[in-house]
Amino acid sequence: MTILNKIVKVGNIEVANDKPFTLFGGMNVLESRDMAMRVCEQYVEVTNKLGVPYVFKASFDKANRSSIHSYRGPGMEEGLKIFQELKDTFGVSIITDVHEIYQCKPVAEVVDIIQLPAFLARQTDLVEAMARTGVVINVKKPQFLSPGQMGNIVEKIAECGNENVILCDRGTNFGYDNLVVDMLGFNIMKKVSKGCPVIFDVTHSLQCRDPFGAASGGRRDQVTELARSGMAIGLAGLFLEAHPDPNSAKCDGPSALPLSKLEAFVSQMKAIDDLVKSFEEIDTSR
């Protein structure tokens, strides 16, 4: 069965399941202005060299940290200043998450994509406020929700007048404190959303929690294998976090790619994407 492929425009980038993949990459949380500039510059250099469409990602507030003592970020006001400087300096589009209704309008005035966090994906008031900004929305699939249920969230956003939706898989609960990625789920999300672009958050899919700890562990030694598997499906994009020194990152370092490995990593992902999308589709439904 042929699946319709919708195109979502992000600046001059066309994001779609049958287009060359877009890299949504950056860092987990804004640690400082200088760190953000350094990371973004490296991503821009690599993606320009390889010819990969690119969107910078980072959070200004990690509002769902396990511990009240954990670093959350610089906050919305300072974060938006950093985002604007990145746009002015590098000409990048930007994606970031919102957690509160009041954040939607001011954030949407600066960034190009606002992200609906997985834990909040069914909160109707927040979904409605995000949708009414008119900007592109990236919906993280909740760890507790089946791929088929994502169609309901897309419909909710559409009912509020916004058709610019991207869906993102970031793993599914597998028992306690562990995640697994269902590779069949990507096509299910394509179908139930009537062709919305589907992307893969490989970084957060590698989380593995310490049941008694105050921070997430991770398995970055498996990031390449998992990302290769996802790219072989034929996706609209890959969501990736990198850090100059993952062991000292202020959030989710155990799942982050070392920044020094970025070019080799993205080069492999592009090779897989190019190959898969060169194939003629085989309809096995009949």
Swiss-Prot record:
Gene Ontology cellular component list: cytoplasm
Pathway terms, separated by semicolons: Carbohydrate biosynthesis; 3-deoxy-D-manno-octulosonate biosynthesis; 3-deoxy-D-manno-octulosonate from D-ribulose 5-phosphate: step 2/3; Bacterial outer membrane biogenesis; lipopolysaccharide biosynthesis
GO MF annotation, one: 3-deoxy-8-phosphooctulonate synthase activity
Reaction catalysis annotation: D-arabinose 5-phosphate + phosphoenolpyruvate + H2O = 3-deoxy-alpha-D-manno-2-octulosonate-8-phosphate + phosphate
Annotated compartments: Cytoplasm
InterPro entries found in the cross-reference section: Aldolase_TIM, DAHP1/KDSA, KDO8P_synthase
Coiled-coil annotated residue ranges, if any: none
Pfam name, any one: DAHP_synth_1
EC numbers: 2.5.1.55
Database matches in HAMAP family: KDO8P_synth
Family membership noted in the UniProt record: Belongs to the KdsA family.
Protein name listed in UniProt: 2-dehydro-3-deoxyphosphooctonate aldolase
Organism: Actinobacillus pleuropneumoniae
Name of the gene: kdsA
